[in-house]
Design a protein with these regions (language model features):
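Aromatic- and Gly/Pro-enriched, solvent-exposed loop/edge beta-strand patches characteristic
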Residues: 64-131, 193-269, 334-401
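Beta-sheet-rich sandwich/jelly-roll-like modules and their strand-loop junctions
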Residues: 1-68, 111-197, 202, 245-338, ...
Length: 414
């Protein structure tokens, strides 16, 4: 099954003939620390169709170039594209990279010729899972040695919080989550120092109280990795999800960064999930948020297009939104309206309004068909100065599965 890996972040590229890295999925600020910009895969398959778009030309000099390359297991792959003088985009639709669960990927950018411009970049790739219905859900977080911390299950930066409700994401479709993989950049300290990573869920069955699931793994010093490929968790549209990071037994002497990945197995083949959350969305000024959050506390942007991520051919549908605070302030009718945007100035039909005492909303009727190079984001418009709130959301990305038909030649008897 094919699924899109969306990425992009408003951080200018380094033009000083530098090498920097970013997370292939989601995106964050460019960094020379490759671990903090790597993501661990929970499923095997192929990665292909690299597209990159800049918001300004690479430069005016003949040698001004930015070269983007998928890194796999610490080595450069053949999936690469160069954006040269005067150009604003590049792609590689020729190469396909075989990837295996438990290995890590990152996106490398190398500048050469000292480009005269330092544009922002958006990018996307395609993951083609070996197993039907499977797609990737990846993140990175910061462990907390002093207290249990929480992170979104899809996340672009090494951050976490002790306030779990701030990192909830909401599942937009039915499926199963399995194959938890975790890699630390340092071991937890001295045995028995450890961190336990657990998928948590809230749904109708548990009265929407976030509860530990059986999908969990514990990493004890001196180890730096662990996984749970045994357990799985069934999810439905509207379920809330978080990842807990628990310092076990003693207070660990080290608080490492953690890469983690899950496999999402959709009930409907062709569906993958885009999951996000934000900090306070405001009360007056329209905000634009990346569909997949680079950090749970993001405030997004007040500039249309600045929080966009790059699309490929797919269909978006099933928008679910959850607020931490209802809009009602007692003065008239207040609401927040969430709309999927496809390119600057263009709203799709996918929209939901959360009003008064409501804290949830969805649009399971409308859909939006995307093309290669579309720039997508989530717009929030406020009506009548509603109460400020954190927001969580989920959206389905659908690509029709390729159907293979066996052909048996008809053999004529002579």
């Amino acid at each position: 099954m094919d699924s899109v890996i969306f990425g992009g972040y408003p951080d200018p590229l380094n033009n000083a003939n530098a090498t920097e890295y970013n997370t292939p999925a989601i995106g964050f600020s460019w960094s020379t620390n490759v671990f903090n910009r790597s993501q661990v895969l929970a499923s095997s398959g192929k990665i292909k169709n690299l597209y990159v778009e800049l918001d300004a030309a690479a430069g005016t000099g003949a040698d001004d170039t930015y070269t983007f390359t998928l890194m796999y297991d610490g080595a450069a792959t053949s999936l690469t594209c160069a954006i040269v003088q005067g150009a604003t985009s590049g792609n590689d639709t020729e190469h396909e990279i075989d990837v295996v669960a438990g290995k890590v990927i990152s996106l490398r950018c190398v500048s050469s010729g000292t480009p005269s411009n330092t544009p922002n970049a958006q990018w996307s790739m395609m993951f083609s899972g070996t197993t039907a219905n499977e797609s990737l859900c990846v993140g990175i977080a910061l462990c907390n040695a002093a207290a249990k911390a929480y992170a979104p299950i899809s996340h672009g930066s090494a951050a976490s919080t002790t306030t779990e409700n701030n990192v909830r994401v909401i599942c937009p479709t039915a499926g199963v989550i399995k194959n938890l993989y975790v890699i630390l950049d340092n071991d937890p300290g001295t045995d028995p120092d450890a961190y336990c990573f657990t998928l948590r869920i809230a749904n109708a069955a548990n009265s929407y109280v976030l509860t530990d699931t059986a999908l969990t793994c514990t990493i004890v010093a001196n180890a730096v990795s662990g996984n749970d490929t045994t357990h799985s968790v069934t999810v439905a549209a509207g379920d809330w999800l978080t990842l807990s990071i628990d310092p076990k037994l003693t207070t660990p002497s080290v608080a490492p960064n953690a890469q983690y990945g899950f496999t999402f197995v959709a009930t409907t083949d062709g569906e993958s999930v885009l999951l996000g959350c934000s900090g306070a969305i405001g009360q007056v000024t329209t905000r634009y948020l990346s569909l997949i959050s680079y950090i749970y506390s993001t405030l997004g942007s007040t500039t249309d297009g600045q929080s966009s991520q790059l699309a490929q051919v797919c269909t978006l549908k099933n928008l679910y939104v959850l607020l931490s605070v209802a809009p009602d302030t007692g003065a008239g009718t207040q609401s927040h309206t969430f709309t999927i945007r496809n390119n600057v100035g263009n709203s799709t039909a996918i929209t939901t309004t959360i009003s008064e005492a409501e804290t949830t909303g969805n649009d399971t009727t409308n859909a939006a068909t995307l093309a290669v190079g579309n720039n997508i984001c989530l717009m929030v418009v406020h009506t009548n100065t509603p109460a400020d709130s954190y927001a969580s959301w989920g959206l389905v990305c659908y690509i029709a599965p390729v159907l293979f038909r066996s052909y048996y030649p008809h053999i004529l008897a002579h």
